[in-house]
């Protein structure tokens, strides 16, 4: 028979392949164009590509998986049985499947089945299998008691059957991909699986569907499947999947998840970027741990372009499995992320460029029924070859960029595509110095030569020794009526290294130090000056990192109590940048500074707002609001909130810049003119 493409051309198609032509995008590819002259391999490749085009995509769904439910019919649990129904209904409404499998369906329906004991024991222990299976004969009272002592789990007498059905269906669907029955496939299954560890279930998960499937493919098809890539974009870290393959060199596990220093579920540090595998599997775990809520399309696409796809290409898998949770989708009350269906479609499309297109999608989480259905439909359409929609955001936020930079530094030890290889920045030899110490030594020397600015002694055990030589002061600040206290982070060093090493070209490297503008200005005004530099890393006596914010707060209190408060200065001005702002705001909350401090100018960039302690005296927030300028990047999350920021955060000023150093330089003239204006107003009362 003949099928028409979008240009009206006709193409010969076998009768057995008739149903596939109901998908418009495929017919566009079926042209009569002949290959250009070339090798026989070119013809063979095109023949292979044509066979892939003619294959259908697979889909597995069985309504019996909805039998797994809470004991109480009125219990509104997020892992709702309707989740799989809504996904299937969305795909059916789009015209890709029907209730009763039909040859005319766009998707080839894969029959569901239960996983066997032998298959499950490839990942899980016999004890865990028995624990789940025993629930089939438990009374409601025993099931309720088991739920109380379980980790985010519920059971009824059908739960074990549904878990076996979900896992077996995943295996069967993936088998169809590996054997070439379909070109790719989507298993709409529940309960989900990626939190189920080898020895215990947890987090709504009974058996680990993806892990059992991956292990089954490796063992059943050793000639075809030697390397498996598992990409887990569920918003939670897949602790069970990572544990199952942590020492396996043949499985690359990549997880993008909300982490927040281990506070987000599953609530451990197992999903941190530093956990990269062990033994022969070292480097085969790639964790991308997002630091906060609100990540969106641009952040995930950035992660895919910078980490996921480069590592995946280098790994060169024979099969791609996706732990496809939709709880990072916009509207999900648990995830609180902002991914659109287009983002899921784009990520799916990128993965389809691997492993000759052998991609298997297995449903995991996702708890907003509208979000999960629209997102799943977008993934299904990508599997069919339909181009993705447009992204909502096309760039990554600063927090995402910071996370990806951290991940690439760690993974550069294991992947050539992540070069230059990250080096150990902890000096161990006597002839090695940290650059921030070298720069501070240079600054101290230059400031002494230009303005006779010297080191201020820090004589207190509670303040880290790292701050020695980091606090400088003008020689006569005690006797000055006007005093400027600047607390800032180390200056930036901009430079380019070689492509294979971390060696900087010093001739092309620059030191960017906007604080020097304020120092020079204060000295020209004949003011007193205290310059406090905050290193990026603060350590204790044994060179172990400590909480930098606590140390900054302690240092600011020390300088105030032992130096500033004892001076004769009547007009004191604070300038803070980055993490240093925490120290100044804490000082204003902890000491009576309002009589002498005329203004606090803080530069925060994209960092979260820093407010006075909530227990502060009643009129202090009002004083702070009236005596502060807080420059915040226009891309800061605070501007997206409907409510106006409270006064305890100070008087907020928008800046077009994101880096605090850029902001300090850009607003230098406005700030210094404002300080002079305040000084002029203060003079009649101070004389």
Curated annotation (Swiss-Prot):
<keyword id="KW-0378">Hydrolase</keyword>
<feature type="active site">
    <location>
        <position position="195"/>
    </location>
</feature>
<dbReference type="InterPro" id="IPR019154">
    <property type="entry name" value="Arb2-like_domain"/>
</dbReference>
<dbReference type="InterPro" id="IPR023696">
    <property type="entry name" value="Ureohydrolase_dom_sf"/>
</dbReference>
<dbReference type="GO" id="GO:0140720">
    <property type="term" value="C:subtelomeric heterochromatin"/>
</dbReference>
<dbReference type="GO" id="GO:1902794">
    <property type="term" value="P:siRNA-independent facultative heterochromatin formation"/>
</dbReference>
<dbReference type="Pfam" id="PF09757">
    <property type="entry name" value="Arb2-like"/>
</dbReference>
<dbReference type="GO" id="GO:0005730">
    <property type="term" value="C:nucleolus"/>
</dbReference>
<protein>
    <recommendedName>
        <fullName>Histone deacetylase clr3</fullName>
        <ecNumber>3.5.1.98</ecNumber>
    </recommendedName>
</protein>
<dbReference type="GO" id="GO:0000785">
    <property type="term" value="C:chromatin"/>
</dbReference>
<dbReference type="InterPro" id="IPR037138">
    <property type="entry name" value="His_deacetylse_dom_sf"/>
</dbReference>
<dbReference type="GO" id="GO:0005634">
    <property type="term" value="C:nucleus"/>
</dbReference>
<keyword id="KW-0156">Chromatin regulator</keyword>
<feature type="region of interest" description="Histone deacetylase">
    <location>
        <begin position="55"/>
        <end position="385"/>
    </location>
</feature>
<keyword id="KW-0158">Chromosome</keyword>
<keyword id="KW-0779">Telomere</keyword>
<keyword id="KW-0678">Repressor</keyword>
<dbReference type="GO" id="GO:0000791">
    <property type="term" value="C:euchromatin"/>
</dbReference>
<comment type="function">
    <text>Responsible for the deacetylation of lysine residues on the N-terminal part of the core histones (H2A, H2B, H3 and H4). Histone deacetylation gives a tag for epigenetic repression and plays an important role in transcriptional regulation, cell cycle progression and developmental events. Histone deacetylases act via the formation of large multiprotein complexes. Required for proper positioning of nucleosomes at heterochromatic loci and for transcriptional gene silencing (TGS) function of the Snf2/Hdac-containing repressor complex (SHREC).</text>
</comment>
<keyword id="KW-0804">Transcription</keyword>
<dbReference type="InterPro" id="IPR050284">
    <property type="entry name" value="HDAC_PDAC"/>
</dbReference>
<dbReference type="GO" id="GO:0030466">
    <property type="term" value="P:silent mating-type cassette heterochromatin formation"/>
</dbReference>
<dbReference type="GO" id="GO:0040029">
    <property type="term" value="P:epigenetic regulation of gene expression"/>
</dbReference>
<dbReference type="GO" id="GO:0033553">
    <property type="term" value="C:rDNA heterochromatin"/>
</dbReference>
<dbReference type="GO" id="GO:0000183">
    <property type="term" value="P:rDNA heterochromatin formation"/>
</dbReference>
<dbReference type="GO" id="GO:0031509">
    <property type="term" value="P:subtelomeric heterochromatin formation"/>
</dbReference>
<comment type="similarity">
    <text>Belongs to the histone deacetylase family. HD type 2 subfamily.</text>
</comment>
<dbReference type="GO" id="GO:0031934">
    <property type="term" value="C:mating-type region heterochromatin"/>
</dbReference>
<dbReference type="InterPro" id="IPR017321">
    <property type="entry name" value="Hist_deAcase_II_yeast"/>
</dbReference>
<keyword id="KW-0805">Transcription regulation</keyword>
<dbReference type="GO" id="GO:1990342">
    <property type="term" value="C:heterochromatin island"/>
</dbReference>
<dbReference type="GO" id="GO:0005721">
    <property type="term" value="C:pericentric heterochromatin"/>
</dbReference>
<dbReference type="InterPro" id="IPR000286">
    <property type="entry name" value="His_deacetylse"/>
</dbReference>
<dbReference type="GO" id="GO:0000118">
    <property type="term" value="C:histone deacetylase complex"/>
</dbReference>
<keyword id="KW-0137">Centromere</keyword>
<dbReference type="GO" id="GO:0031508">
    <property type="term" value="P:pericentric heterochromatin formation"/>
</dbReference>
<dbReference type="GO" id="GO:0031078">
    <property type="term" value="F:histone H3K14 deacetylase activity, hydrolytic mechanism"/>
</dbReference>
<dbReference type="GO" id="GO:0004407">
    <property type="term" value="F:histone deacetylase activity"/>
</dbReference>
<dbReference type="GO" id="GO:0006325">
    <property type="term" value="P:chromatin organization"/>
</dbReference>
<dbReference type="Pfam" id="PF00850">
    <property type="entry name" value="Hist_deacetyl"/>
</dbReference>
<comment type="subunit">
    <text>Interacts with ccq1, clr1, clr2 and mit1.</text>
</comment>
<dbReference type="GO" id="GO:0070824">
    <property type="term" value="C:SHREC complex"/>
</dbReference>
